[in-house]
Amino acid sequence: PVNISISNMGSGVAAIDFTGSKTASTFQVIRVFLDSSQTEELGTFSSQPILLQNLTTDEPYFLKIKATNEYGNSDFTEVLGVVTSANTPKVLIVNGFDRVSGTDNSFDYIRQHGVAIHNAGYIFDSANNESIINQRVKLNDYSIVDWILGEEGSATSTFTVEEQKLVQNFLKNDG
């Protein structure tokens, strides 16, 4: 799965949206807990977007997805997160830390960012930077954007001109 985002859909419901899995027959969703290697399988789904229901309201959920077909499994996606609530999220956390070589990228920094934002009294949605670039998620739907870049290097695209323009537009529109 690519272009991944997780959005609050109301009390106890979250939507996981993505593209790039046309040959997948099912999608396994795993919850990852903060400060623990413990995980919980939330289910296996056959359609998208995936709607997770009966989640605990006002509790951060950190999730990763794996696609499956008759030939095997994809790798798990990066970890993204959401807090479900009756209120509309004002904060979007964007994971732009894609680097895989020459770094210790655990692909789950959203857990630390999400908990800090939630402890400050905010609920949040999240997305990877590709879903922003490809206009699947709009920065201007939020008041606050936390864009995680990590230890990107010059051999990789750090914060592309396209990403910078999207953030500039967000700031010009009172973000």
Predicted regions and their residues:
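Tryptophan-centered short beta-strand motifs
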Residues: 37-45, 73-76
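Extracellular low-complexity, O-glycosylation-prone stalks/linkers
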Residues: 22-41
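Pro/Thr/Ser/Gly-rich low-complexity, intrinsically disordered linker/stalk tracts
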Residues: 1-24, 57, 71-88
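Short beta-strand segments enriched in small/hydrophobic residues
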Residues: 89-102
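Short S/T/G- and acidic-enriched coil/turn segments that sit immediately N-terminal to beta-strands
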Residues: 45-51
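Beta-strand-rich modules
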Residues: 52-71
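Short, glycine/serine-rich, charged loops/turns that create anion-binding
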Residues: 22, 96-99, 152
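Helical hinge/lid and interdomain linker segments adjacent to catalytic or ligand-binding clefts
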Residues: 101-175
